[in-house]
């Protein structure tokens, strides 16, 4: 049985042009919790999807400054994790958890 904390670590799959390109190199991209560490992300992916993770790379996309009705605001920062899977393993991100 999976730990409920794993569901707090992985927020959503990131489906972009770049993430579909890296899927050919056996990698998947997820939006993760801001405070999640690489070992926590690795454990969550292995527990939830039943795959072997070989590497985890993370990045923080800074929120953009936007204007709404004349008032300046800022979008939230988003932390992404690029997960490299073992050979022969894959994750179908189009289905839910």
Curated annotation (Swiss-Prot):
Q: Which example biological process does GO assign this protein?
A: translation
Keywords for this protein:
Ribonucleoprotein, Ribosomal protein, RNA-binding, rRNA-binding
The UniProt entry, under Pfam families, shows: Ribosomal_L23
Any one GO CC term of this protein is: ribosome
Q: Which family does it belong to?
A: Belongs to the universal ribosomal protein uL23 family.
Tell me the subunit arrangement.
Part of the 50S ribosomal subunit. Contacts protein L29, and trigger factor when it is bound to the ribosome.
> What role does it play?
One of the early assembly proteins it binds 23S rRNA. One of the proteins that surrounds the polypeptide exit tunnel on the outside of the ribosome. Forms the main docking site for trigger factor binding to the ribosome.
**Name recorded for this polypeptide:** Large ribosomal subunit protein uL23
Lineage here is: Bacteria, Pseudomonadati, Pseudomonadota, Alphaproteobacteria, Hyphomicrobiales
Question: What would be the name of the gene that encodes this protein?
Answer: rplW
């Amino acid at each position: 049985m999976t730990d409920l904390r794993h569901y707090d670590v992985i927020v959503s799959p990131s489906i972009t042009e770049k993430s579909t390109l890296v899927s050919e190199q056996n990698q998947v991209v997820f939006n993760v919790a801001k405070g999640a560490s690489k070992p926590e992300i690795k454990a969550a992916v292995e527990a939830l999807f039943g795959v072997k993770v070989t590497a985890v790379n993370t990045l923080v996309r800074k929120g953009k400054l936007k204007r709404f009705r004349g008032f300046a605001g800022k979008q939230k920062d988003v932390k992404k994790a690029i997960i490299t899977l073992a050979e022969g393993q894959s994750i179908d991100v189009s289905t839910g958890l």
